């Protein structure tokens, strides 16, 4: 192993920062403007050194407080996320209790709950619109229906779905002899969820 030979460092004796050029000891003072320049240099060096020490201590204090703040923020964030998930799970449980389904031994998954809820809403909407369309004389007339916009929108969606089902049935070679009612389709889907799981 090689050792490095370095010359010993020369240290300039540090003067007291409060000392003025007049208070210097005679052996260290120099005559003329050179003495004041040396004193200024020593003072600035002393001030820089004490300022650096203060900065380092501030950095240490700042980094520890930053670390504590970071930990605190992370804990608060985790708690907010826990509360959010708790609320979400409670909402899913409330939805499971409202939707009619057959399986009582095992709770529905989130995707099953959402799918059944969507289809249940669609079937109820279709039933309500079917019941209300028989009472509205304007909806049975040929041509564009002057009825409610909800009915028109739903009727348009149903026509598109029927066309897609007919195209899919023609491609697969399946024909539907008797169209099923909306509630009957929904109950069939409930039973398929029960058998599938």
UniProtKB/Swiss-Prot annotation:
Composition skew (Polar residues), residue ranges: 27-36
Any GO CC annotation of this UniProt entry: nucleus
Basic and acidic residues compositional bias, start-end: 65-82
Listed InterPro entries: bHLH_dom (IPR011598), bHLH_transcription_factors (IPR050359), HLH_DNA-bd_sf (IPR036638)
An annotated Gene Ontology molecular function: E-box binding
Residue stretches making up the bHLH domain: 72-124
Tissue: Expressed in liver, spleen and olfactory epithelium. Weaker expression is seen in skeletal muscle, cardiac muscle, eye and brain tissue.
Subcellular location(s) per record: Nucleus
PROSITE patterns: BHLH
Primary location class: nucleus
Residue ranges, compositional bias (Basic residues): 1-12
SMART domains in UniProt: HLH
Record's keyword terms, sorted: DNA-binding, Nucleus, Phosphoprotein, Repressor, Transcription, Transcription regulation
Residues recorded with modification Phosphothreonine: 12, 25
Domain of life of the native organism: Eukaryota
Function: Plays a role in controlling the transcriptional activity of MyoD, ensuring that expanding myoblast populations remain undifferentiated. Repression may occur through muscle-specific E-box occupancy by homodimers. May also negatively regulate bHLH-mediated transcription through an N-terminal repressor domain. Serves as a key regulator of acinar cell function, stability, and identity. Also required for normal organelle localization in exocrine cells and for mitochondrial calcium ion transport.
Oligomer and partners: Forms homodimers or heterodimers with TCF3 gene products E12 and E47. These dimers bind to the E-box site, however, heterodimer with MYOD1 does not bind target DNA.
Domain remarks in the Swiss-Prot or TrEMBL record: Lacks a classic transcription activation domain and instead possesses an N-terminal region capable of inhibiting heterologous activators.
Record-given protein name: Class A basic helix-loop-helix protein 15
Organism: Rattus norvegicus
């Amino acid at each position: 192993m090689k050792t490095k030979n370095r010359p010993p460092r020369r240290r300039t004796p540090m003067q007291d920062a409060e000392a003025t050029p007049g208070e210097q000891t005679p052996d260290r003072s120099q005559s003329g403007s050179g003495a004041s320049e040396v004193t200024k240099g020593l003072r600035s060096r002393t001030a820089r050194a004490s300022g650096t020490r203060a900065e380092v201590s501030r950095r240490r204090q700042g980094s520890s407080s930053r670390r504590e703040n970071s930990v605190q923020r992370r804990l608060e964030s985790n708690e907010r996320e826990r509360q959010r998930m708790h609320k979400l799970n409670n909402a899913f449980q409330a939805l499971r209790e409202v939707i009619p389904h057959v399986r009582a031994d095992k709770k529905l998954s989130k995707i099953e709950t959402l799918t059944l809820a969507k289809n249940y809403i669609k079937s109820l909407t279709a039933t309500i619109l079917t019941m209300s369309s028989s009472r509205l004389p304007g909806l049975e007339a040929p041509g564009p229906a002057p009825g409610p916009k909800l009915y028109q929108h739903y009727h348009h969606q149903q026509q598109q779905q029927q066309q897609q089902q007919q195209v899919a049935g023609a491609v697969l070679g399946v024909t539907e002899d008797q169209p099923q009612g909306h509630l009957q389709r929904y109950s069939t889907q409930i039973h398929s969820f029960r058998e599938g799981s």
